[in-house]
Amino acid sequence: MIEIKSKLISLNILWKEGINLGKEAKTNAMRMLDKKKIPYEALTYEVDEFIDGMHCAEITGAPVDASYKTLVMQGKSKQYYVFVIPIACEVDLKKAARSVGEKSVEMIHVKDITKITGYVRGGCSPLGMKKLFPTV
């Protein structure tokens, strides 16, 4: 169970490949926040193959120092892990592996993101994934 303490959470909702998700479209993370009556602001942006966290912050007007990216990795044990890091930072795979007690971790392949998390690249939230994964 994830404890949510924030009064205002910004979420990224995608306009993927020209499909307008519409005003009523909700992600699992949004449904969780709605259920707990936690206010949030949904930000939308176009997703392309070159999108990164810095670009998302720039086009949505979100402050870089308060923006994070969600990275999903798999350990040598085949266990999945979710890492939430500032968008301006790069992940150190050796430190990431040590933090979860693995010999090594690697990023999951882009084609597997939706199957594993339920989200698309560029819009992966640590909240509301298909399964509950250890989150660092």
Question: Where are the predicted features?
Answer:
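Extended, low-hydrophobicity, polar/charged segments
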Residues: 8-136
